[in-house]
Amino acid sequence: MTKAASGDTKSTLYCSFCGKSQHEVRKLIAGPTVFICDECVELCMDIIREEHKIAFVKSKDGVPTPREICEVLDDYVIGQGHAKKVLAVAVHNHYKRLNHASKNNDVELAKSNILLVGPTGTGKTLLAQTLARIIDVPFTMADATTLTEAGYVGEDVENIVLKLLQAADYNVERAQRGIVYIDEIDKISRKSDNPSITRDVSGEGVQQALLKIMEGTVASVPPQGGRKHPQQEFLQVDTTNILFICGGAFAGLEKIISARGAAKSIGFGAKVTDPEERRTGEILRNVEPDDLQRFGLIPEFIGRLPVVATLEDLDEAALVKILTEPKNAFVKQYQRLFEMENIGLTFTEDALHQVAKKAIARKTGARGLRSIMEGILLETMFELPTYEGVEEVVVNAEVVEGRAQPLLIYAEKKGGAASA
C-alpha cells in the first residue's frame, strides 16, 4: 500500500497496520501490496510470546511445572523468589492432586492450603492476581474484611464459593477444582486473647465459619447470591478439592516474634540484636503457629493452613525495578499517558532511586510508588494538553525532592532545556 507524499515526487510507503510512514520507523518490510513496520513486528512477537507462556497450562498432561509457573510470575512480580516457589509448587500439586483423584487411587492426597505473610506493599495480592491470569482452573479473590457470620449484615462465607462458581460460568464440576485467594486475612483475627461474652461476628466468628469450607464440605449456594430463603433452589458445591490461599500484612506480628526471641535470648552468652536493626520481612521468616495464635488466629484455623510463606521487605533496588521492569510498570504507564499528547517522558536514574527512598521512608512498599509519582507529575499533567512545541519532559532527583520543576525540552531547542 503506497501513498504519494504531498510535495514529493517520490512515493512514500506506509505500514498497513499502524499507518506510520517509512520515515517514522527503522524498517518497513514489503509484501504483496502490503507493508509492515519493525514496531508492529515487535508487537506481534510480544503477543505470540505471551500466548506461548500461557499455553503451558494446556499441555498434554495438564500439569505445568513449578518452574514454568515461576517464569510467568517473574514477568509481573519483582523479587519474592521464596513466595513464588511456594505458590508455584502449591498450584502444581493442586493440578496433580486433581488428576490423581480422577484415577480412583487408594491413597487420598490432601490439599495444602497456603498462608502468605508479609509487610504491606510487598506483592501478596499481585501474586494472586497474576496467578489468576495464567492458570487453567477457576480462580476468585475475596476480601476477608467484608465477611461476617451467617445471619449478620455483611457477606456470608459461602458467598466466596458463589464467586468461584461464577468464575466457572456456573459449571459446578469446574468450580470444585478451583482456587480461592482470601485477602486481608489478618483483619479477622480475634479481638483479644480472652473469650468475650459478646459475639465477635467479623473476627473469630468468620474464622469458625471458614473452617468447614477450607477443610471440605458441601456448600449450598443460592445461584443468584444474597441471603437464603426456604423457597430458593440451591446449588451443591463440594469444597474438598478447592485450594485456599490466604494473605495478610499481619501488622504487629513482628513484635510478637521479636518478644518470643528475646525471651529465649537471656543470659551472659546471649546474642543481643536490636529489633530496630532487623527488617520486618526478616523477622517474619521466623513465624511459628504460636505467634499466629497470639496475633488472634484460632488454632483450628491455623491448622487448616499448613504451608506458610513469608514475603520480604522490598529494598531500594527492588523498588527501582518495580518502577521500570514489569510489563505494567508505573514509569511505562505514565510514559504512555504522555505519548497520547505526543510528548516523551524520561526519569533519570537518580530520580528513580529518590522515588524508591521516599517509598521506603513512608513504609508503604510498592503500593506507595504510585502516589509519589502522581504527586511529582500532577502540575505537569495539569498543563500537559496546553504545552506547545514541547518534545520531552525530564524528571530528575531535584524534582522528586520538590526543589525544582520537571525540565521541558522543546523541539526547536534540542540542545537546551527550559524549566517548566
Swiss-Prot record:
Transmembrane parts of this sequence: none
Effect seen on changing residue 13 to A: Disrupts interaction with SocA but not self-association
Record bears the keyword Metal-binding: yes
Residues in ClpX-type ZB domain copies: 3-56
UniProt cross-references to InterPro entries, sorted A to Z: AAA+_ATPase, ATP-dep_Clp_protease_ClpX, ATPase_AAA_core, Clp_ATPase_C, Clp_protease_ATP-bd_su_ClpX, ClpX_bact, P-loop_NTPase, Znf_CppX_C4
Region of interest (Required for interaction of SocA with this protein and degradation of SocB by ClpXP), ranges: 1-62
GO CC, alphabetical: HslUV protease complex
Keywords: ATP-binding, Chaperone, Metal-binding, Nucleotide-binding, Zinc
Gene disruption: observed consequences: Essential, it cannot be deleted. When depleted for ClpX cells arrest before the initiation of chromosome replication and are blocked in the cell division process. In depletion experiments ClpX protein starts to decline after about 4 hours, which coincides with cell filamention and a 1000-fold loss of viability by 12 hours; SocB protein accumulates. Deletion of socB permits slower than wild-type growth of the clpX disruption.
One example GO MF annotation: zinc ion binding
Binding-site residues, ATP: 119-126
A GO BP entry: proteolysis involved in protein catabolic process
Keyword Amino-acid biosynthesis attributed: no
Family matches, as SMART domains: AAA, ClpB_D2-small, zf-C4_ClpX
Chain sites annotated for binding Zn(2+): 15, 18, 37, 40
Family to which this protein belongs: Belongs to the ClpX chaperone family.
Known partners and oligomeric status: Component of the ClpX-ClpP complex. Forms a hexameric ring that, in the presence of ATP, binds to fourteen ClpP subunits assembled into a disk-like structure with a central cavity, resembling the structure of eukaryotic proteasomes. Interacts with SocA.
Domain remark text: The N-terminal domain (residues 1-62) is required for interaction with SocA and targeting of SocB for degradation by ClpXP.
Function, in words: ATP-dependent specificity component of the Clp protease. It directs the protease to specific substrates. Required for degradation of response regulator CtrA, thus contributing to the G1-to-S transition. Required to degrade DNA replication inhibitor toxin SocB, this function is probably the reason why the protease is essential in this organism. Can perform chaperone functions in the absence of ClpP.
Record protein name field: ATP-dependent Clp protease ATP-binding subunit ClpX
Taxonomic lineage of the native organism: Bacteria, Pseudomonadati, Pseudomonadota, Alphaproteobacteria, Caulobacterales
